[in-house]
Amino acid sequence: MATSSHQGAAAGSQAEHRSCEASVGQGERPSASQGQEGNFKQNQGTSTLRLLLLGKQGAGKSATGNTILGKAVFESKFSDHMVTDRCQSESVSVRGKQVIVIDTPDLFSSLSCSEVRQQNLKQCLELLADDHCVLLLVTPIGHYTEEDRETIEGIWGKIGPKAYRHMIVVFTREDELDEDSLWNYIESKESLKELIKNIGSRRCCTFNNKADKKQRELQVFKLLDAIELLMMESPEPYFEPLKMESSGVQGCGNGVTYEGDTLCGSKKRQPQITGPDCDPDMPELRVLLMGKRGVGKSAAGNSILGKQVFKTQFSEKQRVTKAFASHSRVWQGKKVLIIDSPEISSWKLDESAVKNHTFPGPHAFLLVTPLGSSLKSDDDVFSIIKRIFGEKFTKFTIVLFTRKEDFEDQALDKVIKENDALYNLTQKFGERYAIFNYRASVEEEQSQVGKLLSQIEKMVQCHSNKPCVIREKELLNIILLGRSGAGKSATGNTILGRSAFFSQLRAQPVTSSSQSGKRTLDWQDVVVVDTPSFIQTPGTEKDPSRLKEEIHHCLSLCEEGMKIFVLVLQLGRFTQEDEVVVEQLEASFEENIMKYMIVLFTRKEDLGDGDLHDYTNNTKNKALKKILKKCNGRVCAFNNKETGEDQETQVKGLLKIANSLKKNYDEHSNSWVGQLKSTLGQITMAFK
């Protein structure tokens, strides 16, 4: 049979593809409904479906394409550089329909020059022809990185905000999931979770491209079922809206605007590209204006853009800017996107809006503040930004002082040096600051804007043109240990902020098996594991393996992330049983465990007006003193009857200690964490 293959047609030529008679889908497969089957075969009267493989370098696009085709057509090998350097296609007959698989290089990599990206995008459009198309976003399990984010943003920017309606996510390296589930993996990555939320949980599947033939065919069947479902849910033509959106590849023109839902959240931003000189591959600088109400953020944005686009007016009673908005201009061959924002104190009410409009993160923050204003509450402002972007945001920030006109001819450097608050503010941000005079002439205004943009560009270059990415939600596992009756379950309920564990004063142990609960606090997921008293685990006297099983069960309730141990003791009642518990923990987990443990005293209310540290420093109980010394003095106390803000204050105090301990883990003790996991996995029991 004569066949032909297209491997990156020259510009203007018609793309050709090779047709092969191999039919994926023969034999038994998971059944699809008659409606699905009919939709797949007869959709819009077309006989051809194109599957466009998209993803970063090394994601496994070519291998996935080969799995779908049932034969090795696309070159696929492990390499530290890009193997696929041009678009190529191959066809196969599937369920009575011709399916064309299009393999692509990394179309959106910032490491590729704009000419190469432009050429590849053009070839991609040629291969799409006028048929229906489904996008397959390929991403490897366990390796979701900045390049994946770059790909998602590129798809949204080049193909259009409706792209997710035509998309299925294919996770490669299924074998790396081990015993974990795909959904647990997705839940651990905030941006990935947001992507799947918008695409739909039924529009993702897993591939192991190294599996045997039967398993690979089963994977393809599941993918085809997902495609059928997509075609039922989105009956409109697939290619036409994509082609309209992607026409931006040929140039932006004047006043091109789009808004709406995007891949990683609704209304990430609404780019408004102005001017005939806009090139779709033009480097972009995303600049986020931030500050308190009335400081002049919108006015600063208008000044930078050179036009009145953001609403500005003086108002003492209400916010003028109530929602995020963005506009752009071209400056020295770059598209500068200015994102105006409401006052920062409102961000904590809807952090998702911040992430949506700045995704994957701004290249620069402009902290706008009038030169003579009070800065007393700015620390509260910074804490909100840190929660979303992490401590690193300070390295991406420039302070923009306004109202230079109020200081006449005074030198800015002198004003800053003579004002402690201003001096401390500029030191916090590496002495990066600028000033605007809103009464300046047109020439002066253009000059101050040019200087600011040059300063921004210089700062961005110091970060290799990478943005300040939105930080992934962190996770902390807290394992509560201690004797029966010490208050572990009540403490767990306090941390979770709800009654998740049964807690009652009884003579016999209430908790007979480990259990867990989860909450999110200050952009951190916290998993709390309540445990029985291991020395009183039922059946251990006759069968020591029961204890091993319980410890394994305890650890299985933890999620991927740092594990912090909290020894729960009752204030004023340190017993011999408490001492035995600690001895047995050390015997089982090695003495190292005490270096990574926090001591939490319950019944804080019994202290009255006393101080916890006075209590621990002055205790005459030698065994307790020894334990506190081994824990390096990490102690806190809970009144588990507290509610509301007082309860939250206690929890935040514990998490502060735990995160400090976590930081020590990260910086110094990664090897010990692995050793601990190994020790726990092999525990046989040395309890007395």
Curated annotation (Swiss-Prot):
Residues 103-106 are annotated as: G3. It holds the Pfam family AIG1. Residues 31-42 have a biased composition (Polar residues). CDD domains: AIG1 (cd01852). The keyword Nucleotide-binding applies. Abundantly expressed in the thymus (in thymocytes), spleen (in splenocytes), lymph node, followed by bone marrow and lung. InterPro entries: G_AIG1, GIMA/IAN/Toc, P-loop_NTPase. It comes from the Eukaryota. Keywords: Cytoplasm, Endoplasmic reticulum, Golgi apparatus, GTP-binding, Mitochondrion, Nucleotide-binding, Repeat. GO terms for cellular component: cytosol; endoplasmic reticulum; Golgi apparatus; mitochondrion. Residues 55-62 are annotated as: G1. Residues 208-210 are annotated as: G5. The keyword Nucleotide-binding applies. GO terms for molecular function: GTP binding. Residues 82-86 are annotated as: G2. One of its GO terms (biological process) is regulation of T cell apoptotic process. SUPFAM superfamilies: P-loop containing nucleoside triphosphate hydrolases. Residues 46-247, 282-472, 473-677 form the AIG1-type G domain. Residues 1-14 have a biased composition (Low complexity). GTP binds at G55, K56, Q57, G58, A59, G60, K61, S62, A63, S76, R173, E174, D175, N209. Exerts an anti-apoptotic effect in the immune system and is involved in responses to infections. This is GTPase IMAP family member 8. It comes from Mus musculus.
